[in-house]
Amino acid sequence: MDIIGGQHLRQMWDDLADVYGHKTALICESSGGVVNRYSYLELNQEINRTANLFYTLGIRKGDKVALHLDNCPEFIFCWFGLVKIGAIMVPINARLLREESAWILQNSQACLLVTSAQFYPMYQQIQQEDATQLRHICLTDVELPADDGVSSFTQLKNQQPVTLCYAPPLSTDDTAEILFTSGTTSRPKGVVITHYNLRFAGYYSAWQCALRDDDVYLTVMPAFHIDCQCTAAMAAFSAGATFVLVEKYSARAFWGQVQKYRATVTECIPMMIRTLMVQPPSVNDRQHHLREVMFYLNLSEQEKDAFCERFGVRLLTSYGMTETIVGIIGDRPGDKRRWPSIGRAGFCYEAEIRDDHNRPLPAGEIGEICIKGVPGKTIFKEYFLNPQATARVLEADGWLHTGDTGYRDEEGFFYFVDRRCNMIKRGGENVSCVELENIIAAHPKIQDIVVVGIKDSIRDEAIKAFVVLNEGEILSEEEFFNFCEQNMAKFKVPSYLEIRKDLPRNCSGKIIRKALK
């Protein structure tokens, strides 16, 4: 079944410009408060100019171009400008340092980079090492260094015509981007995403939150991340809605931005919810137009209830990962919501719980969450130049092994337990980090929490809790351990406590556990 009607991304943008014309497509707000607005017609013209820019720099179908940018209009121009000429975007996490960025350049075979002045010194060093295929850099800033092989993105773009000059044959099976996973447990792998994947993601995510062309979808998620691209941007554009891209998340500014742009849909991760909850209460807390808040794991029931009550919103749970492109399990339009369930499988997907021998398990039994989709269409195509890694997670018939543990009930609602790699083995017992974190997060003095397993010569692993306290709070070890003993089985009570000012996180807000072990 062809959900997207054989339409690749170049056709999508040409059609959107024709159908929606002067309707607002994109609003970008910088951290400094600068706002840029583009209609569908204007945005398509900027995309065409950018495509022409890349063509003049020698980029052709199949070439890889890396983007190392914060949220900005140029990211959107480049993303779709590249796919219009059949080239491939390689977004780089804007928080990565030199060694990690160089590794992605080397392993993606990117020959051109678009970045900003703040990241340029790092790439100067990378070029001096001569270990990549990078031959040219475009800077989005007006001020340019006097270096060979460096151009002004804006100047070159503005010199280009608004109609596309190079239009090679495209297929929905063509690769649109290679998105490297966050690599919290190992080296990042390049997830190959096709034109079909992105078109399907737009339709699917718009369906999931019942998006209409009069909606305004605001996100603070980083543009180089799958959530921003497939759950937010592609959904908004596919529905003819307005997409608001904020440069960086600020707990103090968030609700003002939601109100300012009259956003009707947004997305949140637990870190956002917790930091929003510690902001001083305001009479304007409920003065917004949000009807859906897309939410991604993990949150305790007490935290969820407090957030929804204070801000007058409801959470639409969505479960997925880079490899699934979208939230393949989640709350569905008109469906009942059963917290803490992560929902039911969406259209075009099947989901099962399987044991260690890859056999389906009945309702109520914990095993690995496995998803069936179509590679290159409803789930990722493969890992770039890594068939061994692809074979480890993706079966020939389309079943994807997520590496997550969970269970389902008799009505087909699924429940997330934890990442397999986050299960602590303590004296013969399996302990879920997420379970403990949800319990401990209910303590009124605690703002943020992560639990990890550390080596123990007697019980395999001991449990250590790292907590961040609410401002001005003091928490003694006695109070902490008493709270744990009252709320969890004795074998689950942490052995160690460390109070910190913050916790290490990757671009998607996930805690980097290996940095704490």
From Swiss-Prot:
**Entry annotated with the keyword Ligase:** yes
Q: Which keywords does the record carry?
A: Ligase
Its family? Answer: Belongs to the ATP-dependent AMP-binding enzyme family.
Kindly state which reaction or reactions the protein catalyses: 4-(trimethylamino)butanoate + ATP + CoA = 4-(trimethylamino)butanoyl-CoA + AMP + diphosphate; crotonobetaine + ATP + CoA = crotonobetainyl-CoA + AMP + diphosphate; (R)-carnitine + ATP + CoA = (R)-carnitinyl-CoA + AMP + diphosphate
What name goes with this protein? Crotonobetaine/carnitine--CoA ligase
Output the GO biological process annotations, alphabetical, semicolon-separated: carnitine metabolic process; fatty acid metabolic process
What pathway is this protein a component of?
Amine and polyamine metabolism; carnitine metabolism
Which function does this protein serve?
Catalyzes the transfer of CoA to carnitine, generating the initial carnitinyl-CoA needed for the CaiB reaction cycle. Also has activity toward crotonobetaine and gamma-butyrobetaine.
EC class, as a word, reads ligase
Gene source species = Escherichia fergusonii (strain ATCC 35469 / DSM 13698 / CCUG 18766 / IAM 14443 / JCM 21226 / LMG 7866 / NBRC 102419 / NCTC 12128 / CDC 0568-73)
Question: Might you give the EC number(s) for this enzyme?
Answer: 6.2.1.48
* UniProt cross-references to PANTHER family, sorted A to Z: ACYL-COA SYNTHETASE, MEDIUM-CHAIN ACYL-COA LIGASE ACSF2, MITOCHONDRIAL
**What GO molecular functions are on record for this protein?**
carnitine-CoA ligase activity; crotonobetaine-CoA ligase activity; medium-chain fatty acid-CoA ligase activity
In terms of domain of life, where is this protein from? Bacteria
